[in-house]
C-alpha cells in the first residue's frame, strides 16, 4: 500500500501506492526521486507525502533537466499525465530567440529521454502553449492533424475534426490522447471525422433555421441569412448591437431590425414564462434548485426527464443526462456527485 522513505536527519516520508508508477517496485536501499506534495501537521510527527505519479513530478523533472526554465527564459504552463505511459507538458518561451520545444527535447533528445527513463518509459509530448485556446488545443492534439475546429465558449468545449484515417490516432489508445489534451487545456474536446462534424453542424443549422422561422415569423430565406451570419439563438438576435445587424446585406432598415429584435425578446419572455409555469407544476424540490451551479433552465430540462428531487438526480448516470444540450458531461458529473454527496454521504 505504501513505502517509507528515509530522508536523512531522522526525517521520513510516505509514498502511497497510487503515487508510484504502475509496475514500479522498490527494494530496501533503493534511491527514490519524488516530489513532496503534502504535509499532514496533525499527526504526532509531521507526516510528509511524496509522489512520482502526479503532474508536479513531471514539471520538476523538466526544471532539473532544462536550465532555461530555472532561468525563466522558458515557462511551463501545464502538464497532464497517464503515469508510466504517456504525458503532455505545455511550454512557452519568454525569449523569442529560444525554441521552447527544441530546448525541452535537448540535443538528440537527451533531455526528454532522461525524463522518460526516470518515469519508467513514460512518453512525453512537448506542446507549444498558445494564448489562442483553439491553437493551443490543436497543438495539444499532436501527433494528430486537426483539419478544423469549432469553439463553443458557452459550454467551454470544442468540436475537433480530423480525417477519417487519422481518427484512431487523434483519440489514442483507450482515449488516451484526447483525454490528456483535455486535461492539459481545460477544454472539453469532442473528436470526430470531418464528415461527422459537417453533418453535426448541418443538423444544428437546420434546428436554428426552424427556430427562427417558428419564433420570429421569418420566411426561410430571411432565417437562412441569420444562420449564415452565425446567429444561433434568440438571445443573440435580441441583444446584439443594432450596428452588427445593419452591417448584414438586406438588413440595412433599422425599423425592420427593431421589429425583429422585438419579436425575439417577446419570444424569449414567452418561453421563460412557460418554463416557469412548468417548473411550478413539476413541484421541483428546493434542494435540487439550490444545488451549486444549478439554474432554473437546467432544472426545467431535468424535470422533463422526470428528475425533480435530489435523490432522483443522485441515481442518474452521466449517460442518462447526455441528451440535455445545455449540460456538458463534466457538468452532469458534477451535479450527480454533488447530489450523491448530499443524499448518500452526508453525516446529517
Residue ranges and their predicted role:
Residues 1-348:
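RNA-contacting regions in translation and RNA-metabolism proteins
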Amino acid at each position: 500500500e505504501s513505502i517509507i522513505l528515509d530522508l536523512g536527519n531522522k526525517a521520513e516520508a510516505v509514498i502511497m501506492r497510487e503515487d508510484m508508477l504502475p509496475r514500479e517496485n522498490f527494494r530496501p536501499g533503493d534511491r527514490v526521486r519524488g516530489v513532496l506534495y503534502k504535509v499532514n501537521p496533525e499527526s504526532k510527527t509531521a507526516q510528509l507525502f511524496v509522489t512520482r505519479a502526479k503532474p508536479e513530478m513531471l514539471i520538476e523533472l523538466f526544471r532539473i533537466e532544462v536550465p532555461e526554465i530555472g532561468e525563466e527564459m522558458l515557462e511551463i504552463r501545464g502538464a497532464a499525465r497517464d503515469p508510466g505511459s504517456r504525458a503532455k507538458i505545455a511550454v512557452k518561451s519568454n525569449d523569442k530567440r529560444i525554441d521552447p520545444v527544441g530546448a525541452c527535447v535537448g540535443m538528440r533528445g537527451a533531455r526528454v529521454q532522461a525524463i522518460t527513463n526516470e518515469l519508467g518509459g513514460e512518453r512525453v509530448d512537448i506542446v507549444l502553449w498558445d494564448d489562442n485556446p483553439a491553437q493551443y488545443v490543436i497543438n495539444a492534439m499532436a501527433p494528430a492533424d486537426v483539419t478544423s475546429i469549432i469553439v463553443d465558449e458557452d459550454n467551454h468545449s470544442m468540436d475537433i475534426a480530423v480525417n477519417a484515417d487519422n481518427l484512431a490516432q487523434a483519440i489514442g489508445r483507450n482515449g488516451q490522447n484526447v483525454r490528456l489534451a483535455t486535461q492539459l487545456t481545460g477544454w472539453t474536446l469532442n473528436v470526430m471525422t470531418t464528415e461527422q462534424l459537417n453533418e453535426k453542424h448541418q443538423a444544428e443549422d437546420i434546428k436554428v433555421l426552424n427556430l427562427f422561422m417558428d419564433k420570429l415569423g421569418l420566411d426561410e430565406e430571411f432565417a437562412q441569412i441569420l444562420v449564415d451570419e452565425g446567429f444561433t439563438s434568440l438571445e443573440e438576435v435580441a441583444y446584439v448591437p443594432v450596428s452588427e445587424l445593419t452591417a448584414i446585406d438586406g438588413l440595412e432598415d433599422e425599423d425592420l431590425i427593431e421589429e425583429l429584435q422585438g419579436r425575439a425578446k417577446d419570444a424569449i419572455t414567452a418561453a421563460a414564462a412557460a418554463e416557469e409555469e412548468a417548473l411550478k407544476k413539476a413541484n421541483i424540490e428546493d434542494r435540487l434548485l439550490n444545488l451549486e451551479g444549478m439554474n432554473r433552465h437546467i432544472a426545467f430540462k431535468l424535470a422533463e426527464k422526470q428528475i425533480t428531487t435530489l435523490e432522483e438526480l443522485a441515481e442518474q448516470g452521466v449517460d442518462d443526462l447526455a441528451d440535455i444540450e445545455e449540460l456538458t458531461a463534466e457538468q452532469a458529473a458534477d451535479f450527480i456527485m454533488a447530489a450523491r454527496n448530499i443524499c448518500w454521504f452526508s453525516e446529517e
